[in-house]
């Protein structure tokens, strides 16, 4: 994907695991080493609230292996037979991030996939709070320790940063 300037947006998974200690595929590094692709972005899921329970209990996390978090719980979504329902999972968070990436690339087509990944990671909102990781109330960590960027994707900030980068 990287050779063809494609950003791969990956759902982190829904086992409530620390991906820095459990091997899950696909990923973008070997044995927690350096990234082998700068166009692979892994996304964890957030609840629709701020505070200690903002990370969805089911969401995988990891300071090395998860890049960003985005809303992924209690998402109103389409379902088969022209219906709608509330869904949750990192597979709901990843499309939200892919949508922001598509918005950036549509407005700023000169940016590469690697630049868009950097924008998404750098422009997000940092939470200055401790959160429950993996749904285990005995596992409380600073939000910044659950993801490489320490941030939640923010479309507004991403577009501002992308406009500056595209100049």
Where are these regions (language model features)?
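Extracellular S/T/G-rich loop segment that most often corresponds to the catalytic His/Ser-adjacent loop
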Residues: 4-6, 24-106, 110, 151-157
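Short, function-defining helix-loop hinge/capping sites that tune catalysis or transport
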Residues: 21, 97-99, 146, 162
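Short Gly/charged-rich anion-binding patches and loops
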Residues: 21, 63, 115
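C-terminal subdomain of the subtilisin-like protease fold in secreted/lumenal serine endopeptidases
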Residues: 4, 38-42, 106-167
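Active-site environment of divalent metal-dependent phosphoester hydrolases
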Residues: 15-20
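A short beta-strand-to-loop transition that corresponds to the Sensor-1 phosphate-sensing loop
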Residues: 12-14, 46
């Amino acid at each position: 994907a990287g050779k063809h300037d494609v950003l791969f947006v990956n759902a982190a998974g829904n086992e409530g695991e620390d991906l820095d200690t459990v091997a899950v595929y696909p990923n973008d590094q070997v044995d927690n080493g350096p990234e082998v692709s700068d166009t692979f972005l892994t996304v964890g899921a957030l609840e629709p609230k701020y505070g200690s329970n903002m990370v969805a209990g089911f969401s995988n996390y990891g300071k090395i292996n998860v890049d960003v978090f985005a809303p992924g719980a209690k998402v109103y979504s389409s379902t088969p037979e022209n219906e709608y329902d509330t869904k949750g999972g990192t597979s709901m968070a990843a499309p939200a991030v892919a949508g922001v990436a598509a918005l950036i690339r549509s407005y700023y087509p000169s940016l590469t996939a690697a630049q868009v990944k950097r924008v998404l990671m750098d422009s997000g909102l940092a939470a200055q709070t401790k959160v429950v990781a993996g749904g285990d109330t005995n596992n409380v960590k600073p939000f910044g320790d659950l993801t490489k960027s320490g941030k939640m994707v923010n479309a507004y900030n991403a577009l501002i940063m992308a406009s500056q980068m595209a100049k």
